[in-house]
Amino acid sequence: MIAGLKGLKLPKDPRSSVTRTATDWAYAAGWMAVRALPEFAVRNAFDTGARYFARHGGPEQLRKNLARVLGVPPAAVPDPLMCASLESYGRYWREVFRLPTINHRKLARQLDRVIGGLDHLDAALAAGLGAVLALPHSGNWDMAGMWLVQRHGTFTTVAERLKPESLYQRFIDYRESLGFEVLPLSGGERPPFEVLSERLRNNRVVCLMAERDLTRTGVEVDFFGEPTRMPVGPAKLAVETGAALLPTHCWFEGRGWGFQVYPALDCTSGDVAAITQALADRFAQNIAAHPADWHMLQPQWLADLSESRRAQLRSR
């Protein structure tokens, strides 16, 4: 689904091509190692790493983000939650590296028992206008996408271009191997919004990660009591095509998974900002219920941006 790499700290300096290449190699090595080793060994290694980072305070931005969810100062975020959050984040990557080698049909049958709210998706497709599934970066959204392909066929999503191009292509190939249709956010033959609209008008499913867009194109919303910006794409697609906008959430349940599709948001007003706020409210409820599984290691709120960055947003 869109991006899926929000926690990465990839270099932006064009002179750092060596570092970018090393990053690509590191992910390639991780992919091979995780597939080659027994599951219990990989799980223990990832969990040990999570506990180590948690004991040393964990990523500062993750702590700040969880503080907003809990409504406490960053220093008051419980250490067990930090540890659980890092373990959840590591589990996501562990499963990403293994997912292409797993029997998808067998796994989909297992997931059939834990996915709720499918009647909302079925109703949307029965109406013939398509469906937009909007999700935050929580749990394992790639696993949910794999299930969707097995039960409803290929869906369409969008991916940000990473650098180096080889790393970007590695993740595109990975998601296409799961049956996703992945459009580049930039540099494609056609604008992604145009293609997504076309897919919806053909009664297809579009899936978008939708809780963060700290750019001038994002719309300002209230999120856990503070202002941030979220992408307008999901709401705009629903308004312009008539597709159902279905908030969706993924989380982990023990060693299993939880997935829930929620009722379609009311988009009849055509007010993209108001619809996006309603989506933000739904996300907030779901993230608060499963805070450890929200994998947001980058700044989420405007207050965490530099003053110069905030000034750029205000100059729109």
From Swiss-Prot:
Coiled coil: none annotated. Hexadecanoyl-CoA binds at H137, R175, E240. GO terms for molecular function: acyltransferase activity. It holds the Pfam family Lip_A_acyltrans. The active site is at H137 (proton acceptor), E211. One of its GO terms (biological process) is glycolipid biosynthetic process. This is Phosphatidylinositol mannoside acyltransferase. It comes from Mycobacterium tuberculosis (strain ATCC 25618 / H37Rv). The gene is patA.
